[in-house]
Design a protein with these regions (language model features):
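Short, surface-exposed loop or secondary-structure junction motifs
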Residues: 124-126, 179-392
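Short, well-ordered beta-strand elements
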Residues: 386-389, 397-416
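Short, gly/Ser/Thr-rich active-site loops of penicillin-recognizing serine hydrolases
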Residues: 361, 416-456
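N-terminal export and membrane-targeting signals
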Residues: 1-5
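Extracellular mucin-like PTS domains
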Residues: 34-67, 71-73, 451
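C-terminal region of N-terminal signal peptides and the immediate post-cleavage residues
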Residues: 9-33, 40-41, 46
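Short, conserved catalytic-motif segment at the N-terminal edge
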Residues: 82-139, 161, 384
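Short active-site loop at a secondary-structure junction
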Residues: 101-104, 128-189, 229-243, 323, ...
Length: 456
């Protein structure tokens, strides 16, 4: 795995200007609300073992189950009695968060420095049938899918099939219903500096998506909703799903394979991520939670089924329109292991890893305190630098954060698109306090040390 210099690490979220850019400082995350942590320790890296759901206290008006997936006995770094108490506190934290933020159901995973893991769940995967969420429940990854698309592109760069400076228009298939400025490069698509407008922000697209929720969209269908450019190429940072939809098409043309196949063959299968799949091109690999949206994050809020009345989300129209920008789904354990492998240097070669971890820019109008690189967000949480990505799609929201200095990885997936999962990540981080968990050994691999912008 890649060795990341401790003084070099500092995290951020979307966007970046291009190779050779000076990294920007990134302030600590300013939480909009707080969830009281229950204090303690933790970390893991092997898939958690399934456990039966156990009931958890909940308000009488909306009883909701919780399920914990204990890790194997640690190798000696954390005493067994301390680990049991730690896992109890982790479960209590997500139970409290689910109630406080009016989330129907959620799943979370923590990977510890000693190679063990914990996965837990709380609430319901399907409210109408009172189907409990478990660690094996899958949720839509939404924009966390961008980390997979970016990884495929960077692998192709490692292999010499693509270059960061390639004009995107020369790598895209012909006949797309969009004009791509010849100055836009692959690097600009990766770091959101292309200036292209986001098709999902076009107010005309939502009624069309919901009119026929079962329809499978093509990239061309989605690209018809791209508006006028927001800026000249390379001049400003604008988060845009259009960039990653185009990157998926570039990867397909460069290899002659569908993006679903590329993600499966290059990333999921080699890493053993069997409960993750590309929804736009594969069948489900795990039970998928229903998605919900609520009108309030107050504890008394009642989840409302989505527009089709079934509660099933996301709509096929939405996930197929998302393509390389947001079509994957999977478990909290899978996305946590993915993040650890990606940022640890186990997915990309030396060139790709160096690119991924070295080029960030501070963002505006996006997420507080976040800098963005080539499909990776950098963010300091309570002074702990992290790398990862967040995601939100109709009915779902989640986040994954890898803390290389602390040796921790934390993921949270929910089936409610309003509540901020970053608040739960922060609460879990406070529970697994690095001050009480033995420090991890430095990550090492044949890849060169990479730098991340210093946290501000």
């Amino acid at each position: 795995m890649v060795a990341i210099g401790l003084t070099a690490l500092g995290l951020g979220i979307l966007g970046g200007a291009g190779a050779g850019r000076s990294p920007a400082a990134s302030p600590d995350l300013a939480a909009a609300a707080s969830i009281s942590p229950l204090a303690s320790t933790g970390r893991t890296s092997t898939p958690a073992i399934a456990a039966s759901a156990t009931p958890s206290p909940a308000p009488p008006s909306s009883p909701a189950p919780s399920a914990a997936q204990p890790s194997p006995s640690p190798s000696g770094l954390i005493p067994a009695d301390a680990r049991a108490e730690l896992e109890r506190r982790l479960q209590a934290t997500i139970d409290r968060a689910r109630t406080k933020l009016a989330i129907p159901g959620l799943s979370a995973t923590v990977l510890f420095p000693d190679g063990t893991s914990w996965s837990g769940a709380s609430g319901f995967a399907r409210v109408a049938t009172k189907t409990p969420a478990t660690p094996e429940t899958a949720f839509a990854f939404a924009s966390m899918s961008k980390t997979f698309t970016s990884a495929v592109i960077l692998q192709l760069i490692d292999e010499g099939k693509l270059s960061l400076g390639d004009p995107a228009v020369k790598r895209l298939p012909a006949g797309l219903p969009i004009t791509v400025d010849p100055r836009i490069t692959i690097a600009m698509l990766l770091d959101h500096t292309s200036g292209l407008a986001d098709y999902f922000l076009n107010p005309k697209i939502d009624p069309v998506l919901q009119r026929d929720p079962g329809r499978a969209w093509t990239p061309a269908d989605a690209l018809r909703f791209v508006g006028k450019p927001l800026s000249a190429p390379g001049k400003a940072w604008h988060y845009s799903n259009t960039n990653y939809l185009l990157l998926g098409l570039i990867a397909e043309r460069a290899t002659g394979k569908p993006l679903a196949t590329l993600v499966r063959e290059r990333l999921l299968d080699p890493l053993g991520l069997a409960a993750t799949w590309y929804q736009a091109g594969e069948s489900a690999k795990a039970p998928l939670a229903d998605g919900y949206r609520v009108t309030s994050t107050k504890p008394t809020a009642r989840p409302k089924d989505l527009a089709d009345g079934s509660g099933v989300a996301p709509f096929r129209s939405v996930v197929t329109a998302a393509g390389g920008a947001g079509s994957l789904a999977g478990t909290s354990a899978d996305i946590a292991h993915w993040a650890r492998a990606l940022y640890g240097g186990d997915v990309l070669g030396p060139i790709g890893t160096g690119i991924l971890l070295s080029d960030f820019t501070k963002t505006r109008g996006y997420l507080p305190g976040v800098s963005y690189g080539f499909g990776v967000q950098a963010l300091s949480i309570d002074g702990h630098p992290s790398l990862g990505h967040s995601g939100r799609l109709l009915g779902f929201r989640g986040a994954v954060r890898d803390f290389p200095i602390d040796g921790l990885t934390i993921s949270v997936l929910t089936n409610q698109s309003r509540a901020d999962p970053g608040l739960i990540v922060r609460s879990l981080l406070r529970v697994v306090s690095p001050s009480t968990v033995p420090a991890p050994s430095p990550r090492a691999s044949g890849a060169p040390a990479a730098s991340v912008p210093p946290a501000g």
